[in-house]
Amino acid sequence: MQLTPREIEKLMVYTLADVALKRKSRGLKLNYPEAVAIITAAALEGAREGKTLEEVMDDSRHVLTKEDVMDGVADLIPHVQVEAIFTDGSRLVTVHDPIQ
């Protein structure tokens, strides 16, 4: 199977997000890479589902809470940016204050 660097990166994001969600379901607090992966995967999936840019940004902002992450992690993530493919083309999604 031949994958482009962008496809490999997305695959890594989805894999880490999957591992992180399993850890979260077991009650473990998430670290920085895990939190970013979950937020990023939520944005990519929202775009894939046909949501608007605004819907994706809003939905991705409510995926995690401060209780889901280790102390200080929320402060380390002022925003998350990812290029997502929407039904009308590729757009940069910026999720401000992603952990409430």
Swiss-Prot record:
It catalyses: urea + 2 H2O + H(+) = hydrogencarbonate + 2 NH4(+). One of its GO terms (molecular function) is nickel cation binding. InterPro entries: Urease_gamma, Urease_gamma/gamma-beta_su, Urease_gamma_sf, Urease_subunit. GO terms for cellular component: cytoplasm. It is found in: Cytoplasm. Its EC number is 3.5.1.5. GO terms for biological process: urea catabolic process. CDD domains: Urease_gamma. It comes from the Bacteria. Pathway: Nitrogen metabolism; urea degradation; CO(2) and NH(3) from urea (urease route): step 1/1. Keywords: Cytoplasm, Hydrolase. Pfam families: Urease_gamma. Belongs to the urease gamma subunit family. Heterotrimer of UreA (gamma), UreB (beta) and UreC (alpha) subunits. Three heterotrimers associate to form the active enzyme. This is Urease subunit gamma. It comes from Photorhabdus laumondii subsp. laumondii (strain DSM 15139 / CIP 105565 / TT01) (Photorhabdus luminescens subsp. laumondii).
